[in-house]
Amino acid sequence: MVYSKYMWSVKGYENQKLFLDNAFVNNKLAHAYLFTGSDRETKKQLAIEFATMILGVSEEEKERINPDLIVIDQSKMKIEEMRALISELSLKPFRYQKKVAIIQNFEDVTDEAASSILKTLEEPNNSSLIILLSRNQKSLLPTIVSRCQSIYFNIHFILLIFNCW
């Protein structure tokens, strides 16, 4: 088995981590990623670690507030909040080369909010990257799914691995 080059704190999901590593190392980052699956906490942790890798955040800086990393963790995100995020992503990064936005529970955003981010996904800004987290991509607009690089996280596979030990 080939292992990731980055020192991820999350155990398991070696193929997903290797895929993200390769995209980063080869400068082939997508403008948007969709992390799907039932393992909510792991998706969030991997998204944050991937974002800090992209930004080049040092170990000492990880605990500090970072204006170039936006993590939204709320249900039923409304169109006004999505527009504010889109506006923030259109601004130049404060410290790093990119701004990264992570939106958790994307399946719970309002239809209007989901539609409003579509233009940003269709016409990406080179200085921003979006990571959407969702339990099931079938609950999302197909046009949003088609604009993102999808990565699936299956908790049952990880539980199977741990049960084999």
State where each predicted segment sits.
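Conserved catalytic/switch belt of AAA+ P-loop NTPases
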Residues: S90, S115-L132
